Every structure is written in C-alpha cells, then in structure tokens.
A protein has these predicted regions:
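A compositional/biophysical signature of low hydrophobicity enriched in polar/charged and small residues
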Residues: 1-115
C-alpha cells in the first residue's frame, strides 16, 4: 500500500491473452516525419491516442522519429488502421514490421535499481 501511495505502483491490471480476444497480430510501426512543430505533434499524438489498437507509442532517437506497437486481429485490420492514421496526419514514411513470434513479454520491471 505504501508503494501505491508513493506512486511506485501506478495501477493494477489484468494481463489478457491477446489470442483469446482476437488480437493475434502484433505490428511494430516505424514512423518518420519531416515535420517537428508542436502543432503537428499534437495532431499526431491525438490521432494515435484515438486508436485503441496502438498499445505503445514512443518518440525515438536515430533514423526513426516514432515507434508504435499495434495489436490487431489480422493484416486487413492493420491496413484499416494505417489508412485512418495517414488520413489524419501527414507522415513522411511509415514502415511496418509484423511480429512472427513473441519470444518474451513482461510487465515486470527490474527493481534492483530502485533507491
């Protein structure tokens, strides 16, 4: 309870088997843009936030500007998501990689580094 009060534990969740809820396809979407204004980013972030299929969203260093992890039932569902995204936001390049097999997935964090 102290960990919750101290903000260490943010929330409690149930871990759901994605196959049991028809989300068998994981897609990693690398996005590059030539626009970096706050206004553009706000529109992009809003578009991504409106898509429940996007389960993670990161701003990256290196060649990729943003990385999304998307979970969908099939490739057609991803294609529909992709079309909705590019309809709302001007993107320079979108590269999608489909996960063939999940080797490791954990939400447990290494607590050895905690103060």
């Amino acid at each position: 309870q102290r960990l919750e009060e101290g903000g260490v534990i943010q929330r409690r969740v149930a871990l759901v088997d994605p196959h049991k809820i028809n989300l068998a396809v994981t897609v990693f979407v690398a996005v590059r843009t030539n626009q970096h204004s706050d206004e553009w980013f706000q529109g992009f972030a809003e578009a991504v936030s409106d898509m429940p299929e996007v389960v993670e969203f990161y701003r990256m260093s290196g060649d990729i500007d943003y990385l999304l992890r998307v979970m969908v039932p099939d490739i057609d569902a991803y294609d529909q998501l992709y079309k909705r995204l590019i309809e709302r936001v001007d993107l320079f390049d979108v590269s999608s990689s489909f996960a063939m097999e999940r080797i490791k997935l954990t939400t447990a964090l290494p607590v050895d580094y905690a103060d």
